[in-house]
Amino acid sequence: MALQVRVAPSKVVLQKFLLCVILFYTVYYVSLSMGCVMFEVHELNVLAPFDFKTNPSWLNINYKVLLVSTEVTYFVCGLFFVPVVEEWVWDYAISVTILHVAITSTVMLEFPLTSHWWAALGISKLLV
C-alpha cells in the first residue's frame, strides 16, 4: 500500500488562496465593525487591521476592539477556510498570516516589532 499524495494545480491553489485572503479581510472588517458597536467606539481608522502601534492597555478602548476583532477573525476564518480549501487549512491560514504581516509592514512603513502584536497573532493562530 503506497502513500499517494495529490497535488493541486497551481491555478486552483492560487484561486483558493485569493478567496481565503478576501474572506479573511471581510471577516476582519465585519468583526471590527461589530467591536466598534459593542465597545461604543464611534471612530476607528480604516487601516485598523494593520495598526500595531496602538497603546496596549486594557483602559484603551481602541486596543480592546483591535484585540478582540483579531481573535474573532482568526477563529471564524478557521471555520470558514474548511469548506473553501477542504484540506491543508493550516497551510492556507499561515500563508494568509504571512501576507497580512507583509501588508502590515507595507502600510505602516515599518516591520512590527511590538511584542503585544505578535502575542495576539500567535494566540490567534492557535484558534485556527
Curated annotation (Swiss-Prot):
Protein name per UniProt: Putative transmembrane protein 244
GO cellular component terms, semicolon-separated: membrane
Domain of life, source organism: Eukaryota
Entry-linked InterPro entries: Integral_membrane_SYS1-rel (IPR019185)
Entry keyword set: Membrane, Transmembrane, Transmembrane helix
Location of the protein in the cell: Membrane
Membrane topology: Multi-pass membrane protein
Transmembrane intervals: 17-37, 65-85, 93-113
